[in-house]
Amino acid sequence: MGDLDLYNFVDNHDVERIYTKLSNKAHFAPVHVLLYTLPGVPSIYYGSEFGIEGKKERTSDDSLRPALNLADYADAVEKNPCTALIAALGKVRQNTPALNYGSYAELMLTNRQYAFARDLDGVRVIVTVNNDDNVASMDLTAGNAAEYVSTLTSEKVSVENGRIHVTVAGNSGNIWVPAGDMPEYKPVEMNAKTPETTNTTVKADNEDQTKEEAAATVAEQNTTPTSQALKNAANTDSIKETVATTVGN
């Protein structure tokens, strides 16, 4: 087994909630597919599994650290696509040793698509991410299995000449495992929930804040650190934004 890495995060108690940070809410799915499959230990900040919003304020962090009544979210796994996705990803990772301990190999990278493999003891798990609004096709190097199955959609694909040809829906991700080697998984809805309100403007925290300062705050919301370990995988605009959001320094 490989060395254990430090944990990865997309938000925490000091920064804006991921659902607020994402300009395209549909990217909630590919961001979290990456969080649960890239090398490292995934960390979810409480409440973000429900897709709650939280904007960084100048004078207070109260909006980042709300008191939640868990009774209000009792049926979130059934009714909230964000929660259903996080629960499914946790189950997949728990049952897939390669995602915990496997080596990493990049398979494909464009400005909107990204694919990589996690290999462990002869088992290859393939992860595909599509940040585009349209369906994407990928032709990827497979492992020794004759067939692969998606843990998120239950779709099956055959291995031909050592490769698999898969299609990935827009603004989504997939985790492909050798068919028969892993438990059966219930398909999940990949679309992020529609927020009741969206933070599209920045209100001044005091009367002295100018419109220019507010605009600067909006620009700052879209700036995130990029992990050195994934610099090669984050060298194009759309995927760079997603990977940078996924891995915290």
Protein language model annotation of sequence segments:
Residues 1-38, 50, 57, 99, ...:
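Alpha-amylase-like alpha-glycosidases and glucanotransferases acting on alpha-linked glucans and related
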Residues 14-16, 50-52, 73, 114, ...:
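Short, solvent-exposed loop/turn segments at secondary-structure junctions
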Residues 41, 60-61:
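Short helix/strand-capping turn motifs
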Residues 64-107:
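Aromatic- and carboxylate-lined catalytic core of secreted/periplasmic carbohydrate-active enzymes
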Residues 107-142:
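Carbohydrate-binding surface patches
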Residues 141-154:
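Solvent-exposed beta-hairpin/edge-strand motifs
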Residues 160-195:
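C-terminal beta-strand-rich structural cap/linker in extracellular carbohydrate-active enzymes
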Residues 188-249:
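Intrinsically disordered, low-complexity repeat and linker tracts
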